[in-house]
Amino acid sequence: MTEYLLLFVGTVLVNNFVLVKFLGLCPFMGVSKKLETAIGMGLATTFVLTLASVCAWMVNSFILLPLGLIYLRTLAFILVIAVVVQFTELVVRKTSPTLYRLLGIFLPLITTNCAVLGVALLNVNQSHNFMQSAVYGFSAAAGFSLVMVLFAAIRERLAVADVPAPFRRSSIALITAGLMSLAFMGFTGLVKF
């Protein structure tokens, strides 16, 4: 149990996919203008990342490795992610039409989110077992969601703040993301792998 807790804390805080590994920056910058949208995107990404991580592990363990098709890993994982995203899109459309409209084009873009593919590839490269894959996928998604919600809350405050003209919009957003990344560097050394 301690191993899974360390994996969770290490992935969420120490090795955050957005602020440390710089994966998933497109939705991080694009969907974080409103807190409501960021929460929805975080939930959708959490579902997709966790499910895609487990499915990718199963495809790798039960199909690619036994058949010696390791060279097809990236292509196979992209297909797995596309199927999981389509399934998620159907679920979100049926359960929350408002969230589906708010997420707009960003929901199908989860397919091309490099964080999802990155988690799947790192998962198999680190030789995780099934349970570790599930925890790693969920932890990466939790870290992504945490950073996204914090960033959206800050951006909402910045939207009404008196920011100098040269720093408005994207400039202040990038500066804020950099400062958040520096803050997360404070967690370095918290968990040793």
From Swiss-Prot:
- KW Transmembrane (keyword) present: yes
Topology class, membrane: Multi-pass membrane protein
Keywords in UniProt for this one?
A: Cell inner membrane, Cell membrane, Electron transport, Membrane, Translocase, Transmembrane, Transmembrane helix, Transport
- Its EC number is 7.-.-.-
Q: Where in the cell is it found?
A: Cell inner membrane
- One GO BP annotation of this record: electron transport chain
Membrane-spanning residues where?
5-25, 39-59, 62-82, 102-122, 134-154, 171-191
Q: Which Gene Ontology CC terms are recorded? A: plasma membrane
Q: Enzyme group, top EC level? A: translocase
Query: Is Electron transport included in the keywords of this UniProt record?
Result: yes
| Alphabetical list of InterPro entries matching this protein | Ion_transpt_RnfA/RsxA (IPR011293), NqrDE/RnfAE (IPR003667), NqrDE/RnfAE_oxidrdctase (IPR050133)
* Domain of life (superkingdom): Bacteria
Q: Which family does it belong to?
A: Belongs to the NqrDE/RnfAE family.
Function according to Swiss-Prot or TrEMBL? Part of a membrane-bound complex that couples electron transfer with translocation of ions across the membrane.
Q: Could you describe the subunit structure of this protein?
A: The complex is composed of six subunits: RnfA, RnfB, RnfC, RnfD, RnfE and RnfG.
What name does this protein carry? Ion-translocating oxidoreductase complex subunit A
Taxonomic source organism: Yersinia pestis (strain Pestoides F)
Record lineage = Bacteria, Pseudomonadati, Pseudomonadota, Gammaproteobacteria, Enterobacterales
Q: Which gene encodes it?
A: rnfA
